[in-house]
Amino acid sequence: MSGKLTHIDQTGAANMVDVGSKDETERQAVAEGAVRMKPETLALILEGNAAKGDVIGTARLAGIMAAKRTSDLIPLCHPLMLTKVAVEIEPDENLPGLRVRALARLKGRTGVEMEALTAASVTCLTIYDMAKAVDRHMEIGSIRVIEKSGGKSGDWAVSDPALMR
């Protein structure tokens, strides 16, 4: 890993990285996050009784849509032709809450970590939005990249994927 910030030039100004000379490779990133909530809120969501409708289905779609809009949201991110975005939402009664895992993939010249992080973040935000009427104490946390593959820096994965214990 380089000790240099790639989006800052020698004068300290922010710039978009020129990826034109990079080789196209298969690239993938997986990010995760979680929404901690009251057990009764989790039960309400799992039973499909939230006032705003299907929380899990809506949050999943929101995450996928957000990944495709990452370059509109994060300055200096390249617009990417994603080949796959997938979002999984799993209940965890021990949390209690919902765990989110988002995958982004492409064949291109730059990584997809920001797209995976955006998908995970917006999925969690949507869960919060759809359930906040019954639980204002929900907590969103531990949003992070847990694995990436492809590109010059190669493959990487966290050694302990558990979060929000």
UniProtKB/Swiss-Prot annotation:
Assigned keywords, A-Z: Lyase, Molybdenum cofactor biosynthesis
Listed EC numbers: 4.6.1.17
Pathway recorded for this protein: Cofactor biosynthesis; molybdopterin biosynthesis
SUPFAM superfamilies associated with the record: Molybdenum cofactor biosynthesis protein C, MoaC
Active site (UniProt): D129
Quaternary structure and interacting proteins, as annotated: Homohexamer; trimer of dimers.
Keyword Metal-binding: no
Residues binding substrate: L76, C77, H78, M114, E115
Protein purpose: Catalyzes the conversion of (8S)-3',8-cyclo-7,8-dihydroguanosine 5'-triphosphate to cyclic pyranopterin monophosphate (cPMP).
Reaction(s) this enzyme catalyzes, per UniProt: (8S)-3',8-cyclo-7,8-dihydroguanosine 5'-triphosphate = cyclic pyranopterin phosphate + diphosphate
Record-stated family: Belongs to the MoaC family.
Protein name in the entry: Cyclic pyranopterin monophosphate synthase
GO-annotated molecular function: cyclic pyranopterin monophosphate synthase activity
GO biological process assignments: Mo-molybdopterin cofactor biosynthetic process
Pfam family, one: MoaC
